Structure formats: C-alpha cells, structure tokens
A protein has these predicted regions:
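Metallo-beta-lactamase
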Residues: 147-179
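Short hydrophobic/aromatic beta-strand or adjacent loop that forms the aromatic wall/cage
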Residues: 18-20, 108, 155-159
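A short catalytic or substrate-binding loop motif that flags glycine-/basic-rich loops and adjacent residues
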Residues: 13-17, 151-154
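Short, hydrophobic beta-strand segments that form beta-sheet elements in well-ordered domains
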Residues: 12-15, 30-34, 80-84, 101, ...
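Beta-strand-turn-beta hairpins that frame and shape the catalytic cleft
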Residues: 5-12, 25-31, 110-119, 163-170
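Pre-active-site segment of Zn-dependent metallo-hydrolases
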Residues: 3, 22-62, 67-75, 128-146, ...
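Active-site HxH/HxHxD metal-binding segment of metal-dependent hydrolases
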Residues: 45-111, 116-131
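A short, compositionally biased domain-edge/stem linker segment
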Residues: 1-6, 19
C-alpha cells in the first residue's frame, strides 16, 4: 500500500505512480497532479482509495498523465481541473468532461482561490536517456481522438507553483532529470 507521508511543513504527499501525486496542503486543500490511476500498467493506484480531490493539475495530456481524468471528475465533480489551453477541448471530448470545472491554462496565468494560489509556468517535455523521445504525437494509435490529445500533450506542457494558505510554496516541475 502506498502511504501518505507527512512533512514538517504540514504537507502530506503520496506518490500514485509515474508522475502522479496526491497532496494535502496545510490548509486542507487536496490536490492531484498528473493522476494516472487504475489504467497504469505499472503499479496502478485504485481510484476508490482517493477520498477527496479539490484541484487536479495536468502538466500535459499524454495518457500516462491524463487518462484517469474522466473517472476522477465523475467521482469528484467539484474538483477544479487545470490543463493547457490548447489541450483542453480535446481532453473534454476524449473523456467527456464537464467544462464548468475546467480551467484552460496558459503560461504566466495565476489562479487565486481561498485556500491556495496556482501559477502556471511554461515547460518542455524531456527526452529519455539516449535522446529518444517516445511520446511524440504521431507515434500514437490510429484513433483520431487519441492522436489529437496525444499531439497536444507533446505540443504544450506546464509546470505549476502552488502557494498554500499559510504561505508554503511548492513547485510542480516535470521531467526525468534535474539537469
């Protein structure tokens, strides 16, 4: 079982799989970042084990970051979902999302709520070791919808800076290396 870890700042963090995390901030806000759950091929995390989601942040829309989003919204219909502006329409179509809780995000935008602030930062998908980039949009299955959503996942990517109600800051920074 994947346990929630508590840090001295009061933040609770649980790795879900791949790039996915569940985070509980000191003020109580529950965030999911790139949650790939039951569908994951390695170490799936059951959606049924998630008790709450107030905010869902997608760095990009490759399936290993976004495939669970439709099921998450069905379980937590009030959750605010943040996704790149170019990817939003295809994401809604692919996973039949309620657009009222979807935030189309561009780099530099800031979203302020009572319990946190979310800032979007431009990012770039990293290459794997050896220089291979396995997630290119044109390498995806021939399903037109999937091809489009994967293409946008390769086209735009976001990092996020979260400021909790107590002033604690967290940076969501994607990539396979710290270089």
């Amino acid at each position: 079982d994947k346990l929630m870890e508590m840090f001295s700042s009061g933040i609770k963090l649980r790795w879900l799989n791949n790039a996915g995390f569940e985070m509980i901030l000191p003020g109580g806000a529950h965030l999911l970042v790139d949650p790939w759950l039951d569908e994951a091929q390695i170490e799936p995390f059951p959606l049924v084990k998630l008790e709450r989601a107030d905010y869902v942040l997608l760095t990009h829309t490759h399936i290993d970051h976004a495939q669970s989003i439709g099921r998450i919204q069905k379980k937590f219909p009030g959750a605010a979902i943040f996704v790149g502006d170019l990817s939003a329409e295809e994401l809604c179509r692919e996973y039949d999302l309620n657009v009222e809780r979807l935030f189309r995000v561009r780099s530099g935008e800031v979203f302020e709520f009572d319990d946190l602030k979310i800032e979007a930062i431009a990012a770039r998908h990293t290459e794997s070791k050896g220089g291979n980039y396995w997630n290119r949009g044109y390498c995806i299955a021939e399903d037109g919808k999937r091809k489009a959503i994967e293409f946008y996942g390769s086209l735009e990517m976001l990092n996020y800076r979260i400021t909790a109600s107590d002033g604690t800051r967290i940076v969501i920074w994607g990539g396979m290396t710290t270089q």
